[in-house]
């Protein structure tokens, strides 16, 4: 079996703020071609880690290695990374072509090569023919696709995405997730993604890092995180969960795993809520003093 190549390694990395907040004892290996998502509530430290990888924040302690080489002393523009933020950061007075070409021109890439690379990249993100348009003529999803394309044109070793779809509506977010998966698969690039949206993390990721209060609660595949949560925080943060306290322990049961025993015949219950969720309906019913969701 071929050994996987480590693309990014965080070694006992820490970033502390003056007020004591931040992250510490961060250790993680990310392998080539993976999409790894940092998932957690606001303020848990996920964006802090991403910004230290990109060089937009200095580490307090520890090391960050890309392809085995330390990058902690390199400024952002010298790092083999490209970062896409929630805001698109496209220049409104430039055409899409000019926005895409800007970084390549700074690197003194010949115009003929720039034209060929932009043509190929626009085909990859399904936006051929948009070269002469301006950002204001594009939808939010299209602008984010161009922002991602601009980053990919620089051929980074790591693509860093800081909640890039959070400003988009639900349907466009889903389309963008599918588009990102396709692009990542076609290019084989390593992606570090940050989100507070559990559905987004589950849909996109090869592995998920669930964070809480500046630390890792669990690192695993979406299936491992969902089926075998390591802590109560992970269990409550991922999917729906019923918690049943039993003495000094807590039993966690997902609603879809509950089976009603019909052995005692029909039971009367009061329907408390009905939620239509596309192809299925969630009912909350009250039976005596027991609440059951199914």
Residue ranges, per PLM feature:
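The feature captures the beta-strand-to-loop junction immediately N-terminal to the Walker
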Residues: 39-41
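Conserved ABC transporter NBD signature motif
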Residues: 62-70
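Non-catalytic connector elements of ABC transporters
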Residues: 250-294
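ABC ATPase nucleotide-binding domains
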Residues: 35, 76-230
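Helix-to-loop junction immediately C-terminal to a conserved catalytic motif
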Residues: 54
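ABC ATPase nucleotide-binding domain helices that frame the ATP-binding cleft
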Residues: 47-50, 146
């Amino acid at each position: 079996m071929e050994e996987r190549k480590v693309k990014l390694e965080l070694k006992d990395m820490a970033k502390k703020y003056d007020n004591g907040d931040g992250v510490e004892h961060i250790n993680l290996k990310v392998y080539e071609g993976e999409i790894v998502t940092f998932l957690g509530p606001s303020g848990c430290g996920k964006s802090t880690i991403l910004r230290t990888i990109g060089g937009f924040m200095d580490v307090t302690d520890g090391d960050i290695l890309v392809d085995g080489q330390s990058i902690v002393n390199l400024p952002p523009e010298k790092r083999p990374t490209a970062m896409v933020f929630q805001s698109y950061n496209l220049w409104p007075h430039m055409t899409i072509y000019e926005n895409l070409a800007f970084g390549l021109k700074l690197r003194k890439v010949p115009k003929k090569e720039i034209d060929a690379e932009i043509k190929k990249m626009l085909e990859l993100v399904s936006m051929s023919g948009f070269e002469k348009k301006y950002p204001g003529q594009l939808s939010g999803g299209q602008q984010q696709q161009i922002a991602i394309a601009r980053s990919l044109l620089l051929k980074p070793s790591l693509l860093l995405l800081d909640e890039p779809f959070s400003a988009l509506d639900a349907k466009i977010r889903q389309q963008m997730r599918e588009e990102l998966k396709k692009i990542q698969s076609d290019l084989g690039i390593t992606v570090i993604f940050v989100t507070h949206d559990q559905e987004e993390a589950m849909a996109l990721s090869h592995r998920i890092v669930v964070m809480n209060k500046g630390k890792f609660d669990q690192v695993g595949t979406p299936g491992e995180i969902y089926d075998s949560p390591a802590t109560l925080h992970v269990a409550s943060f991922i999917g729906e969960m019923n918690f049943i306290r039993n003495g000094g322990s807590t039993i966690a049961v997902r609603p879809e795993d509950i089976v009603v025993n019909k052995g005692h015949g029909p039971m009367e219950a009061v329907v408390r809520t009905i939620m239509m969720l596309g192809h299925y309906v969630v009912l909350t019913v009250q039976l005596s003093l027991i609440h059951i969701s199914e």
